[in-house]
């Protein structure tokens, strides 16, 4: 899924977990321009837990030769998806301690313009990620929510835009 007319502006699938429960239940979109797939190894410590937060669709693909790219269409040699573009990693340590890391593969996830295009959902995801990493056993969390007076932007994936353009 991507923004209409711009296949590099991804609208990844939001996987259901502690970080994304609020976003996935509200059918929100996350916008990740120029995201790269995160490759996880099959061979890692038993104490690690890796959860997918954001994934691309089954029809996604990764361009191999971006510097000499002539088209955004899929070409032979391009890598088939789906890809993970956001992951949460946790590890249980001694003395009931835990390490928690969240990694997103697009720095523009933090961009104000990208956040506005999805009516604040990107910043909600970042806030939920920080909240997950900072939560502790007594249940205290971080809350940075604010009420925006901005207007909402209607985000329409490319397939839906093509469908509705027939009627307009």
What kind of region is each of these model predictions?
Residues 116, 143-167:
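Short, aromatic-rich amphipathic segments at membrane interfaces
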Residues 1-140:
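Acidic, S/T/G-rich, low-cysteine, solvent-exposed domains in lumenal/extracellular/periplasmic regions
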